C-alpha cells in the first residue's frame, strides 16, 4: 500500500469512533482530509464539526457538513487528527500544517482524541521532526533566542502566516525525553502562542496504518 492508501485506511477507520448526533472535532492535514471524506459519507448522522483550520472548514462545507464555532460548543465527543510524530506514551508533535493552536484548543474541548497516522509517524523519541512553535510576530527573535537556550535550532518558516495571523518557528535538533516539561517550558516563553507538543493532553487512541492493516494502540 502507498502512504496515501495507509492514510485513507486510518481516516475511514476513525468513523468507528464517531457517534450519531454528535459534533465532531476535525483536524488538519493530508490524513485528516481522508477522515473528512469519510465523515461526508455519514453527514446525515452527525450534527456537524468543529474545524481546526480554514482549509478543513472549506472541505467540510464542500461536503455539506455543518461547521460550528468552537465558542458555541461546551465539549466535543471526539477529535480526530493526524500527527507528525507520535511516541509510545501517545504524546505527539503536531503543527506541520501550521494549525497547532486551533488543534490544541479542539483537543482540550474533546473527551476523546483519536490520532490517525501511518506507521512512519511512530517514533521512540520525539524531536526528529522539527517542533513547530506559533509565535506573535513581534516576539519572533526573542523566542528564537530562548529556544536556542533549550538546545534547539529554530528556523523561521518563511512565507507562512497562521490562520490566527502569527508566525511559525520550527525547532530542529531537539531530543525530547520529557515532553511534558518541554511543552510547559516553551509555552511559558513570552510571545509564544503555543508549541506543537501534545504531551499534557496526548492521544487516547492511535489508529496506525500498516502494510498488515490498521492497528489500534491505546494508552
Swiss-Prot record:
Any GO BP annotation: D-ribose metabolic process
A GO cellular component annotation in the UniProt record: cytosol
Pathway: Carbohydrate degradation; pentose phosphate pathway; D-ribose 5-phosphate from D-ribulose 5-phosphate (non-oxidative stage): step 1/1
Record keywords, A-Z: Isomerase
Cross-referenced Gene3D superfamilies: 3.30.70.260, 3.40.50.1360
Listed CDD domains: RPI_A
Transmembrane annotation, as ranges: none
Positions with a binding annotation for substrate: 28-31, 81-84, 94-97, 121
Catalytic reaction annotation: aldehydo-D-ribose 5-phosphate = D-ribulose 5-phosphate
EC number: 5.3.1.6
Class of this enzyme: isomerase
Catalytic-site annotation from UniProt: 103 (proton acceptor)
Any one GO molecular-function label of the UniProt entry: ribose-5-phosphate isomerase activity
Family label: Belongs to the ribose 5-phosphate isomerase family.
Complex formation: Homodimer.
Role according to the record: Catalyzes the reversible conversion of ribose-5-phosphate to ribulose 5-phosphate.
Protein name: Ribose-5-phosphate isomerase A
Organism name: Pectobacterium atrosepticum (strain SCRI 1043 / ATCC BAA-672) (Erwinia carotovora subsp. atroseptica)
Phylogenetic placement of the source organism: Bacteria, Pseudomonadati, Pseudomonadota, Gammaproteobacteria, Enterobacterales
Gene: rpiA
Amino acid at each position: 500500500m502507498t502512504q496515501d492508501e495507509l492514510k485513507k485506511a486510518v481516516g475511514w477507520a476513525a468513523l468507528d469512533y464517531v457517534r450519531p448526533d454528535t459534533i465532531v472535532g476535525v483536524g488538519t492535514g493530508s490524513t485528516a482530509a481522508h477522515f473528512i471524506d469519510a465523515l461526508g459519507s455519514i453527514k446525515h448522522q452527525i450534527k456537524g464539526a468543529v474545524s481546526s483550520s480554514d482549509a478543513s472548514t472549506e472541505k467540510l462545507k464542500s461536503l455539506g457538513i455543518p461547521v460550528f464555532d468552537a465558542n458555541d460548543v461546551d465539549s466535543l465527543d471526539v477529535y480526530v487528527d493526524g500527527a507528525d510524530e507520535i511516541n509510545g506514551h501517545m504524546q505527539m508533535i503536531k503543527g506541520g500544517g501550521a494549525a497547532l493552536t486551533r488543534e490544541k484548543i479542539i483537543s482540550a474541548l474533546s473527551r476523546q482524541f483519536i490520532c490517525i497516522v501511518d506507521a512512519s509517524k511512530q517514533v521512540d523519541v520525539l524531536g526528529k521532526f522539527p517542533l513547530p512553535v506559533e509565535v506573535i510576530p513581534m516576539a519572533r527573535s526573542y523566542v528564537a533566542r530562548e529556544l536556542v537556550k533549550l538546545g534547539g535550532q529554530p528556523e523561521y518558516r518563511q512565507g507562512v502566516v497562521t490562520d490566527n495571523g502569527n508566525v511559525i518557528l520550527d525547532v530542529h535538533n531537539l531530543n525530547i525525553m520529557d515532553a511534558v516539561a518541554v511543552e510547559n517550558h516553551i509555552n511559558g516563553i513570552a510571545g509564544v502562542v503555543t508549541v506543537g507538543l501534545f504531551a499534557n493532553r496526548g492521544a487516547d487512541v492511535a489508529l496506525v496504518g500498516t502494510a498488515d492493516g490498521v492497528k489500534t494502540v491505546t494508552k
